[in-house]
């Protein structure tokens, strides 16, 4: 027998409470100095931003990565990595997988739902250094570009 149409129109409880007191996942590890030393073998020194030693930046330096552009969601990551190639991204993700470190990929950080903002102390992989327009077809109007390209690149 079919359920009444009333049951389908009833409001469902909203269970999304991602930003309300999200405890750290006990199965994930935090970034430490050993991890930063490994990332330094993969990336240029200017591509590693961290509040941990040896770089020890002030936390305010990471605010643009820990907060969405609307100021609605706020994260608490202490490390931002800015790879330039897909090979570097691959090596970072492999290391984080092996060491059970959480990762948050971040393109242009233009998300309206907070998907690019870390919940806890995950590593942010900022893809801004990969922002390139590879080609443009003037006949069709199509751009072929890398992932973090935003509309302002096309002007």
Walk through the language-model features, giving the residues of each.
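Noncatalytic alpha-helical scaffold of FAD-dependent oxidoreductases
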Residues: 1-155
């Amino acid at each position: 027998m079919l359920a009444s149409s009333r049951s389908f129109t009833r409001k469902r409880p909203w269970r999304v409470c991602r930003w309300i007191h999200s405890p750290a996942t006990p199965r994930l590890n935090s970034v430490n100095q050993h991890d930063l030393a490994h990332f330094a073998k993969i990336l240029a020194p200017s591509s590693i931003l961290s509040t941990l030693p040896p770089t020890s930046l002030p936390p305010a330096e990471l605010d643009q990565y820990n907060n969405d552009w609307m100021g609605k969601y706020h994260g608490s990551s202490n490390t931002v990595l800015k790879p330039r190639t897909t090979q570097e991204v691959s090596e970072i993700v492999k290391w984080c997988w092996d060491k059970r470190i959480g990762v948050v990929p971040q393109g242009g950080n233009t998300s309206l739902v907070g998907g690019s903002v870390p919940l806890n102390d995950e590593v942010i992989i900022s893809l801004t250094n990969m922002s390139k327009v590879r080609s443009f077809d003037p006949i069709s109007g199509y751009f072929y570009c890398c992932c973090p390209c935003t509309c302002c690149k096309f002007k």
